[in-house]
Amino acid sequence: MGRTYIVEETVGQYLSNIGLQGKAFVSGLLIGQCSSQKDYVILATRTPPKEEQSENLKHLKAKLDNLDEEWATEHACQVSRMLPGGLLVLGVFIITTLELANDFQNALRRLMFAVEKSINRKRLWNFTEEEVSERVTLHICASTKKKIFCRTYDIHDPKSSARPADWKYQSGLSSSWLSLECTVHINIHIPLSATSVSYTLEKNTKNGLTRWAKEIENGVYLINGQVKDEDCDLLEGQKKSRGNTQATSHSFDVRVLTQLLLNSDHRSTATVQICSGSVNLKGAVKCRAYIHSSKPKVKDAVQAVKRDILNTVADRCEILFEDLLLNEIPEKKDSEKEFHVLPYRVFVPLPGSTVMLCDYKFDDESAEEIRDHFMEMLDHTIKIEDLEIAEETNTACMSSSMNSQASLDNTDDEQPKQPIKTTMLLKIQQNIGVIAAFTVAVLAAGISFHYFSD
């Protein structure tokens, strides 16, 4: 027997309202949460059409299996950034006429694997062996609005065959979620070895974040001030409300403790590197995660929080690098420090749901731009007044080291009174072996948090 997908009714309404409008097909993403017993789908969003597609409608029918995978996977990566901990892109859907159904089966399968591969490549974490590895493909008839087929594939096996799956609609699914919130203070020092000058600054930073991710993975997580057994029910000890009001409005405060000292069984020696610079990420991040209220386990809640911490830090760095690349200007050779501001997190409620999605905003971006980006990526209307800016803006410093030297020092905490809006190249003077170091302030707010570093 295949997997069961419990789907929010509004998702069905959304899919029914999508018309082909002269196109051969419309494709998009399915978003929700996996569990051992069943999966929950709370959102669907179609892939935005390319401008040039409207000019090629006459030729689409001749190339039915040529879905634009690059365009669709880029949309999936953008949407993945907007998901808090606990939510994933669960699969893809496509809407066609009934007579074209068979022509799209292979294309839909390829698209599903391409989307998963593209999203997974950017993550700082890996799925566990116990987690569900199946992703769904949904094919809908454009005229009847009914399901043609619903199938799953094992993403760990590129040669896996399709398995049938149940697709069941349920009202009120989006309100049955528990939220977990925490604010994580970070101070990540990433030395840039002189031997890694051929790498881009982005790649060096990603390598450093991968090492930091192990600290987050191995941390101790307090839920409402308590350490709980990972196999316990998250709602154990919680008072349940009477009547029809379920215990779905609960919000949990999570605090993270990272290892302070190594015990005698894990001795370590200091490593001295010849460095051309260093990267220091410093500040605080607001994290949120959601899990469905049906028999939630502590380990599932902790895992969702961990992944949100890792995702939001990695995503902000990636967004900053993209912004610097788009606005590329020559580097100031006489400048030892440059200051940048990482984007801060903005939350918005999913209509009719207790779940909030997120986006990232630079200081010079308006609320209207963020609203428009939400609408473009998620194909849902939101109001500016619903935007919740969860963090305050901090500055970030970039220091260049013009001479390679052995360094174990922390970066200077000095910051300017005003952010200096200079840009930095992704590849910094590799021909002379100079890699810049910069400090990124990763944005603040909210709940207290204890962070210990060596």
Curated annotation (Swiss-Prot):
In the bilayer, the protein is annotated as:
Multi-pass membrane protein
Looking at the UniProt entry, the stretches that span the membrane are 82-102, 432-452
Q: Where in the cell is it found?
A: Membrane
- The highest taxon in the source lineage is Eukaryota
Cellular component annotations (GO), alphabetically ordered: endomembrane system; membrane
* Any one of the GO BP annotations: protein localization
Q: InterPro entries given for it? A: ODR-4-like
Q: Which Pfam families match?
A: ODR4-like (PF14778)
Functional summary from the UniProt entry:
May play a role in the trafficking of a subset of G-protein coupled receptors.
Report the sequence similarity comment from the record. Answer: Belongs to the ODR-4 family.
**PANTHER family assigned:** PROTEIN ODR-4 HOMOLOG
Name the record gives this protein: Protein odr-4 homolog
Taxonomic lineage is: Eukaryota, Metazoa, Chordata, Craniata, Vertebrata
State which gene encodes it: ODR4
